[in-house]
């Protein structure tokens, strides 16, 4: 009987030594698993938290940077002096400002430009400015083209009837350069000279065009008479054969 009692005791002792974990309660197992899950959740949440903190800048600093970019939206590349000035205003480092502008030129700047184009008030002002500059450029170019640059341009101007004395100064022919005109003037009858004497008495009967043509004819007659007098003097000075 003692041997039989010792036998079962010996068979139970190795089982108890080999499997101590099986004797734990289910409540302890669930608590251990919940702790492990909480630890893994914290480990996974740390990188996301750090990532969010990395890109967040103060709202006042971002507003200053956005205002500067809007003013210089057509050339949003600040120089070193401008970066230093923005750094003092925003209390940010030069590296942070440089990185913000790199990202803003890709994400914020296109929206700014598109918003300016879609704004009807700004677009209307831009159209008015362009029209005004176009008018100024055309007004500046017209005097340069219309101004006389030489004697050819002066001759192309419209002619108006001028007083008799002024026409005589402008249209007086050179006696040496126009011999054919002298000969035609000599061949004209002298009766028309008498008509010129009567013309001043009745200026209202003579049109401006006829008056202009008649004055030029008188100049030719005067030149012809002067030339005839010179020829007579030359004949008198020549010795008789």
UniProtKB/Swiss-Prot annotation:
Keywords: DNA-binding, Homeobox, Nucleus, Transcription, Transcription regulation. Residues 48-111 bind DNA. Its main location: nucleus. Residues 1-58, 126-210 are annotated as: Disordered. Signal peptide: none annotated. PROSITE patterns: HOMEOBOX_2. Pfam families: Homeobox_KN. InterPro entries: HD, Homeodomain-like_sf, KN_HD, TALE_homeobox. Residues 195-206 have a biased composition (Low complexity). Residues 21-39 have a biased composition (Polar residues). It is found in: Nucleus. Gene3D superfamilies: Homeodomain-like. GO terms for biological process: negative regulation of transcription by RNA polymerase II. Specifically expressed in adult testis. One of its GO terms (cellular component) is nucleus. One of its GO terms (molecular function) is DNA-binding transcription factor activity, RNA polymerase II-specific. May have a transcription role in testis. Belongs to the TALE/TGIF homeobox family. This is Homeobox protein TGIF2LX. It comes from Homo sapiens.
